[in-house]
From Swiss-Prot:
Subunit structure: Homooctamer.
Gene: GLN1-5
Modification type N-acetylthreonine: residues: T2
GO cellular component: chloroplast; plasmodesma
Protein name, UniProt field: Glutamine synthetase cytosolic isozyme 1-5
Keyword hit for Ribosomal protein: no
Length: 353
């Protein structure tokens, strides 16, 4: 038996041409996702056809109270898995009324790099592995963990099945299907090493699209956990001690790296990353020093290293890439709370320009 509220939520709106567009943007902390909805007269498939909008930037730490208006520019459209039909999710970035980007608009900065002719010619692909931890809402302690206590040591939980090893799978599967419905290039999902921690992947996507897709996938995950009364944490080290942290490993390749002989170019790119190690670390996520300790499948934050199939290195090259002499590499330094606009554009800038 359905409730009156669920009946209203599932109302059939097919008799109206109007749609609901949920405008999504990033708040002042760089990790808080905000959104609000508006009615449009009919279906829209191109973001350039969407109206700009505004919001109170003084309530998101992005503007002063006496000049609080911040303008949203629609940039990417995805199907809305919550309202369904012709309703849409709209990824936006933020600008001052005069037209200049607000300081926290990393998307605008990234587009400049991805629009550079040398970068465009290389068709940079990014695949991002987003790890996260599910927490009980009232106590902010991982799902499946005894209240105030700890589960058994790590080992049985990675890609595991069973009620004593996998906690929150319904959320993971709902998120997976919602992302597919929305048109996101979600490539997979799996349980992680620490119990209560999971991962989903955005498959190789060109340029700025990888950042747009990861932010919308995060938004969908936040909405699903909201419905379930669970908190999703992107903290890179949510539990101190002998537990794995949470990362956003970023896989990268260029057109040249994907061709025969590309392994030599991958090695050259890795050398460039080593030279700018400190600059990348500074932009790879807040609190990352708690994760990058040299333990739990990480490299020490102060030391750059790379290796084939080495998950304790800063950068990993896969066995298949080594064997075929072409392919991609994985930057294992970005934390789970990184800004993908910043990370992807920095990798492209350092290795191509």
């Amino acid at each position: 038996m359905t409730s009156p509220l669920s009946d209203l939520l599932n109302l059939d709106l097919s008799d109206t041409k109007k749609i609901i567009a949920e405008y999504i943007w990033i708040g002042g902390s760089g990790m808080d996702i905000r959104s609000k909805a508006r009615t449009l007269p009919g279906p829209v498939s191109n973001p350039t056809k969407l109206p700009k909008w505004n919001y109170d930037g003084s309530s998101t730490d992005q503007a002063a109270g006496d000049d609080s208006e911040v303008i949203l520019y629609p940039q990417a459209i995805f199907k809305d898995p919550f309202r369904k039909g012709n309703n849409i999710l709209v990824m936006c970035d933020a600008y001052r009324p005069a037209g200049d980007p607000i300081p926290t608009n990393n998307r605008h900065k990234a587009v400049k790099i991805f629009d550079h002719p040398n970068v465009k010619a290389e068709e940079p692909w990014f695949g991002i592995e987003q790890e996260y931890t599910l927490l009980k809402k009232d106590v902010k302690w991982p799902l499946g963990w005894p209240l105030g206590g700890f589960p058994g040591p790590q080992g049985p939980y990675y890609c595991a099945v069973g009620a004593d090893k996998a906690f929150g799978r319904d959320i993971v599967d709902a998120h997976y299907k919602a992302c597919l419905y929305s048109g996101l290039s979600i490539g997979g999902a799996n349980g992680e090493v620490m119990p209560g921690q999971w991962e989903f992947q955005i498959s190789p996507t060109v340029g700025i699209g990888a950042g747009d897709q990861l932010w919308v996938a995060r938004y969908i995950l936040e909405r699903i956990t909201e419905i379930c009364g669970v908190i999703v944490s992107f903290d890179p080290k949510p539990i101190q001690g002998d537990w794995n942290g949470a990362a956003a490993h970023t896989n990268f390749s260029t057109k040249s790296m994907r061709k025969d002989g590309g392994l030599d170019l991958i090695k050259e790119a890795i050398k460039k990353l080593e030279v700018k190690h400190k600059q990348h670390i500074a932009a790879y996520g807040e609190g990352n020093e708690r994760r990058l300790t040299g333990k739990h499948e990480t490299a020490d934050i102060n030391t750059f290293s790379w290796g084939v199939a080495d998950r304790g290195a800063s950068v990993r090259v896969g066995r298949d890439t080594e064997k075929e002499g072409k392919g991609y590499f994985e930057d294992r330094r970005p934390s789970s709370n990184m800004d993908p606009y910043l990370v992807t554009s920095m990798i492209a800038e350092t290795t191509i320009l």
